[in-house]
């Protein structure tokens, strides 16, 4: 009987599986070669740095290989050294330098004027004002909430103006002279006086 494992796709004895294993091994070998070559290059660079650091001669300082990281270790600024040279008299101040300094000052002033604009936020109003002679720009006209508040304040002012002070004086009612009063007067005097008295008269009760 033949081996049934040869029919399986995962069988390591198959030619296609052996080919895959061989290709993976070749890739690992190539990667190891590249890693070793890179390590050798790094070692050579380190040796060159060591040799260049050992050289102290002034003529060979400029020959030092530039790595692009010199600015990280450069603490001396050229501007300060130039200013010190002018103060000590080692260098002369010419008209061209004065013209350049004047142009630089003008450019700095113009930039400062552009940057003087500042914002003030006061609730709803956002007003941009500047230190120059420009008029202040009011942006509250575009805000619906500001319009609503302004209309509300105007309405309250009109209501206060329309309200008038009222007097709390009550009207005085005078007793009417009519048929009822004559009827009580024609009878007994005591009854008419009692009915027409201040406490029992209906006109005084109101």
Swiss-Prot record:
<dbReference type="InterPro" id="IPR022209">
    <property type="entry name" value="CWC25"/>
</dbReference>
<dbReference type="Pfam" id="PF12542">
    <property type="entry name" value="CWC25"/>
</dbReference>
<dbReference type="InterPro" id="IPR019339">
    <property type="entry name" value="CIR_N_dom"/>
</dbReference>
<feature type="compositionally biased region" description="Low complexity">
    <location>
        <begin position="186"/>
        <end position="206"/>
    </location>
</feature>
<keyword id="KW-0508">mRNA splicing</keyword>
<dbReference type="InterPro" id="IPR051376">
    <property type="entry name" value="CWC25_splicing_factor"/>
</dbReference>
<protein>
    <recommendedName>
        <fullName>Pre-mRNA-splicing factor CWC25</fullName>
    </recommendedName>
</protein>
<keyword id="KW-0507">mRNA processing</keyword>
<comment type="similarity">
    <text>Belongs to the CWC25 family.</text>
</comment>
<feature type="coiled-coil region">
    <location>
        <begin position="17"/>
        <end position="63"/>
    </location>
</feature>
<dbReference type="Pfam" id="PF10197">
    <property type="entry name" value="Cir_N"/>
</dbReference>
<dbReference type="GO" id="GO:0000398">
    <property type="term" value="P:mRNA splicing, via spliceosome"/>
</dbReference>
<dbReference type="GO" id="GO:0005684">
    <property type="term" value="C:U2-type spliceosomal complex"/>
</dbReference>
<feature type="region of interest" description="Disordered">
    <location>
        <begin position="165"/>
        <end position="206"/>
    </location>
</feature>
<keyword id="KW-0175">Coiled coil</keyword>
<keyword id="KW-0539">Nucleus</keyword>
<comment type="function">
    <text>Involved in pre-mRNA splicing.</text>
</comment>
<comment type="subunit">
    <text>Associated with the spliceosome.</text>
</comment>
<keyword id="KW-0747">Spliceosome</keyword>
């Amino acid at each position: 009987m033949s081996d049934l494992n040869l029919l399986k796709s995962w069988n390591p004895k198959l030619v296609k599986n052996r080919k895959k294993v061989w290709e993976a091994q070749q890739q690992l070998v190539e990667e190891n070669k590249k890693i070793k070559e890179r390590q050798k290059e790094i070692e050579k660079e380190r040796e060159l740095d060591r040799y260049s650091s050992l050289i102290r001669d002034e003529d060979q300082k400029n020959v030092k290989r530039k790595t692009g990281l010199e600015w990280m270790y450069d603490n001396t600024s050229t501007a300060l050294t130039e200013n010190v040279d002018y103060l000590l008299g080692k260098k002369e101040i010419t008209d061209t330098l004065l013209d350049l300094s004047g142009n630089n000052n003008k450019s700095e002033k113009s930039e400062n004027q552009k940057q003087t604009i500042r914002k003030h936020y006061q609730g709803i109003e956002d007003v941009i004002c500047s230190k120059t002679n420009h008029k202040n720009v009011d942006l509250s006209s575009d805000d619906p909430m500001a319009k609503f508040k302004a209309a509300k304040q105007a309405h309250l002012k009109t209501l206060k103006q329309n309200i008038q002070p009222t007097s709390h004086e009550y009207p005085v009612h005078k007793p009417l002279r009519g048929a009822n009063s004559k009827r009580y007067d024609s009878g007994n005097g005591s009854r008419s006086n009692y009915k027409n008295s201040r406490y029992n008269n209906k006109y005084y009760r109101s």
